[in-house]
Every structure is written in structure tokens, then in C-alpha cells.
């Protein structure tokens, strides 16, 4: 695979990663709302909070992947 093809593939991965980040942020916002409603209703939030932590970890992983892709793309542009 040539340099140009690799760069195109990395750009596609970057677009996909950006989509995953946006989706993950949306899920996190919804999960926080769910936790808030549970608190207001006096319900347990343990499972919801564990889910939120997992979503936040996923977001961190996606953001790390994005930084890595951007670094590689910058290197290829030199």
C-alpha cells in the first residue's frame, strides 16, 4: 500500500473516530441525565454510574486514538 493510500485510510479512520467520539459524548450526556432522574426518584444509581464510567473510559480511548491518528497524519505531511 502506497503512502497516499495509507494517508487516505488514516483519514477515513479519523472520520470514523470522530463519529465514535460524538456518539460516545451523546451517550455520556444521556447517562448523566438518567443518573440525575434516578437520584430525583430515590433509586439506586450504582449500575448507571458503572456504565457512565465505562463510557468515559471509552471516550478516553477514542480521544487517544484520534490524537494518534492526527500525529501520524502530521508526520506524513512533512
Locate each region found by the language model:
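Anionic, Ser/Thr-rich low-complexity intrinsically disordered regions
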Residues: 1-78
Amino acid at each position: 500500500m502506497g503512502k497516499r493510500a495509507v494517508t487516505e485510510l488514516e483519514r477515513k479512520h479519523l472520520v470514523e473516530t470522530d463519529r465514535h467520539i460524538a456518539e460516545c459524548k451523546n451517550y455520556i450526556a444521556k447517562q448523566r441525565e438518567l443518573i440525575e432522574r434516578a437520584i430525583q426518584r430515590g433509586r439506586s444509581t450504582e449500575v448507571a454510574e458503572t456504565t457512565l464510567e465505562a463510557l468515559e473510559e471509552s471516550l478516553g480511548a477514542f480521544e487517544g486514538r484520534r490524537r494518534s491518528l492526527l500525529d501520524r497524519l502530521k508526520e506524513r505531511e512533512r
